[in-house]
Amino acid sequence: MHVLTPSLYIYAFFIVCVRLKCGRSKRVANAKHATYDMPPKGLRVRDMLEKTAQQNCNQRKRGKCRKFFFLWKMDKMGDTHLGGQANGRKNLLRSESATDEASLGGNPLKEKLKESPANWGKDKQEEQQSTDRLPLPKVGNKMPEKKPDWFHVPAPTGKKYNELKADLKKLKLHTVCEEAQCPNIGECWNIGTATIMLLGDTCTRGCKFCSIKTSSKPLPPDANEPFNTAKAICEWDINYVVLTSVDRDDLPDGGASHFAKTIELIKFSRPEILIECLVSDFQGNVDSIRKLANSGMEVYAHNIETVRRLQKFVRDRRANYEQSLWVLKTAKEINPLLYTKTSIMLGLGETKQEVLQAMADVRQNNIDVITFGQYLRPTKNHLNVVEYVSPQMFDYYKEEGMKMGFKYIASGPLVRSSYKAGEYFMKNLVEQRRGVKLHAEG
């Protein structure tokens, strides 16, 4: 029996190590002259690019995307690393890919890969840039150098103006004429026209064009305001009155019941008086809209203020273009006897095409009356005036609007949504009624 000594153990360990080392050297030597069955190490970068491109693929049918990327990979790698079956497989995939592209109307991703990466998304960028190039109103931006001559108006004076101002102060009533710094206050008050502002003088919204005070928690409405308003209006020698208000999102119904009570008291004392109400959107509350529409008013007014593109730059975030149009449409559906009315400010960077599109949207929602006026910045803390629109352009919008079928349009640099509302509206209404009467007699 042989006994293994320590020296034999050492010798055996040495032999094993030598054989392992020789075997590894042989494999390395053979590998230098062998044909690779796998892609060389340099293709790892290509694989990374392929993976990135595949992640950016927007094709709905991902199976076809994978097929395309497999074809693309074979084209890049060549026949060397795919064996003798590469050519047949490539031709098959090419024919299938061509069929898929034909059924999809062409492969947009393949065309995109042919382009320089710098041009990827160029169409979308150009579309965005075309909108970005349009001017936008912004607080603090540079104003036009000089206000045109047609904006020069005399300071408010006159006996009627002073009497009306005293009555409003005595009854603790507010007017949008004063709060919004309307340039026509002297002219309107001297002919006995005023726009009474209900629900206080503090708004819960902060539109960037308006100078009315704002607060998230304004004072509660004055319970005596409907009575005082009705008393003042009945004492004035007027046949048309405009009631408006601040936005009161803090109230459950947005102040609709307060409006309705005021209208009821006015109509009780003077049923013949015509009432126009310029109201908020009530956050789309149908019950509030219904309450106002059935309150006895003749004209339901709500302003969209500007074109669709500029809404988020001009109005409070809680207001929007679609909701404003929907409110007017809904009021008309609830009470078809109502006249609906809206207003647009010009000079905020809108284009002619955008104004015409807004007019078409308004008319599509069966709105009867629209007014156009020039936006004037109340203070330096409000949006800048992008341009002063010429009187000729205001006339152009009026002509185009009448072609669209509006019942009446007031358009001019100094026109406001309530500016001479009774004069404009009554004149047009009387002319329409006269035309119907003459037609019936004929």
Swiss-Prot record:
It comes from the Eukaryota. Pfam families: LIAS_N, Radical_SAM. It is an enzyme of class 2 (transferase). It is found in: Plastid, Apicoplast. Its cofactor is [4Fe-4S] cluster. Pathway: Protein modification; protein lipoylation via endogenous pathway; protein N(6)-(lipoyl)lysine from octanoyl-[acyl-carrier-protein]: step 2/2. Residues 189-407 form the Radical SAM core domain. Residues 92-154 are annotated as: Disordered. GO terms for cellular component: apicoplast; mitochondrion. This is Lipoyl synthase, apicoplast. It comes from Plasmodium vivax (strain Salvador I).
